[in-house]
């Protein structure tokens, strides 16, 4: 009976969640609502949250899916308190399986690893063991990583390379024949305001408030760290966004562009071969990490990022005619990728991958332009054709 209720609830929730394509539309997701929907209040779910937050009530909330909240409002009354508790217990156990005993981990992998993700084997034990330190104490681990693997010279080179790529993107904006001067002006303002984070944060996170007790279980200590993180986030309510805060650890092999703060971040983890090598030529570095940086910069002007202004606010700064021209060009790119057969009978979803496809093309173009404008390109182009360069 419990399992049937859990599966039934998941199926109902699944049918009320926006499709992935719709979730790519910022204006469709950002809906300011007042108060908490009635059913949540009727089940006394709001009070403990409000008490923990230290505020009397939610005056406004940015709801990513109002449709989902409306569904919850109508669905909760159909469940008993016992069914709601069973669902929440299952959710906690499922989320905690990674720090529980092997039988919980194995059961979780059978479902979410094999069935949902198609994996054949779980990650090795050492890698799973590093998950919690990397997430809960990410910057502490990152500080150790940076001291050993990321010299200051790497950061200096990268900051210069990023500025060259910023100039190159500015050139491409100027060269757009379909964009008006008014919209180009705002695009340049946004590009100039772009915050760049390279390698590691200037100020490391202070974890001294996390209380680790060796006498307690692994699970209890993980929960204690989670409580600290939650309270740390509560303290940010009602305060200006700290744009110096990092949202990716230094040892992470990845990068990001955040439209809501208009920033790009390249942790030390990705600034190593094959992406970056201080001893390599400019041609190699522009062709590797340069393309990645150009990709992330372009996200600021793709089908999602273009809806945010220089400050990260959701504002339409495009002239209507420019927006219409952009959409027509984007539709053509979407159609092109819809025809890509990724497996027999399986085609790419050009609408869902549109942002990445735009960023990939932008990254290549920007990196090439930046390299050709660099001093090193003159000598390199003597050895290769213009296409090879």
Language model regions located:
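Conserved small/polar residues in nucleotide/adenosyl-binding loops
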Residues: 1-2, 6-16, 384-389
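Noncatalytic, helix-rich "gating/capping" subdomain that lines the substrate-entry/channel surface
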Residues: 9, 14-160, 164
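Zinc-dependent metallohydrolase catalytic domains
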Residues: 24, 159-290, 299-386
């Amino acid at each position: 009976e419990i399992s049937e209720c859990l599966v039934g609830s998941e199926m109902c929730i699944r049918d009320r969640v926006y499709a992935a394509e719709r979730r790519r539309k910022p204006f469709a997701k950002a809906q300011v609502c007042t108060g908490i929907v009635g059913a949540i209040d009727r089940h006394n779910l709001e009070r403990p949250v409000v008490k923990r937050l230290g505020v009397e009530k939610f005056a406004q909330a940015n709801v990513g899916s109002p449709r989902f909240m409306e569904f919850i409002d109508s669905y909760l009354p159909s469940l008993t308190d016992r069914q709601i508790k069973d669902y929440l217990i299952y959710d906690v156990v499922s989320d905690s399986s990674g720090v529980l005993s092997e039988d919980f981990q194995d059961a979780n992998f059978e479902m979410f690893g094999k069935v949902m993700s198609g994996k054949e084997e779980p990650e090795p034990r050492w890698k799973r063991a590093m998950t919690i330190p990397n997430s809960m104490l990410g910057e502490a681990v990152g500080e150790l990583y940076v001291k050993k693997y990321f010299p200051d010279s790497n950061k200096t080179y990268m900051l210069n390379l990023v500025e060259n790529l910023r100039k190159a993107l500015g050139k491409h904006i100027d060269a757009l024949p379909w964009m008006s001067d008014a919209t180009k002006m705002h695009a340049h303002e946004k590009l100039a305001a772009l915050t760049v984070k390279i390698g590691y944060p200037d100020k490391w996170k202070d974890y001294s408030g996390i209380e680790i007790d060796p006498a307690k279980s692994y699970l209890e200590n993980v929960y204690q760290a989670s409580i600290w993180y939650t309270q740390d986030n509560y303290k940010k309510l009602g305060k200006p966004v700290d744009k110096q805060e990092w949202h990716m650890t230094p040892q992470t092999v990845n990068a990001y562009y955040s439209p809501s703060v208009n920033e790009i971040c390249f942790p030390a983890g990705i600034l190593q071969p094959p992406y970056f090598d201080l001893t390599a030529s400019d041609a190699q570095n522009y062709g590797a990490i340069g393309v990645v940086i150009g990709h992330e910069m372009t996200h600021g002007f793709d089908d999602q990022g273009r809806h945010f202004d220089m400050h990260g606010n959701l504002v339409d700064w495009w002239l209507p005619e420019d927006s219409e021209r952009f959409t027509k060009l984007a539709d053509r790119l979407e159609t092109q990728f819809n025809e890509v057969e990724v497996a027999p009978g399986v085609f790419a979803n050009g609408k869902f991958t549109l942002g990445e496809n735009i960023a990939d093309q932008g990254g290549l173009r920007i990196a090439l332009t930046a390299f050709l404008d660099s001093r090193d390109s003159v000598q390199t182009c003597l050895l290769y054709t213009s296409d090879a360069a």
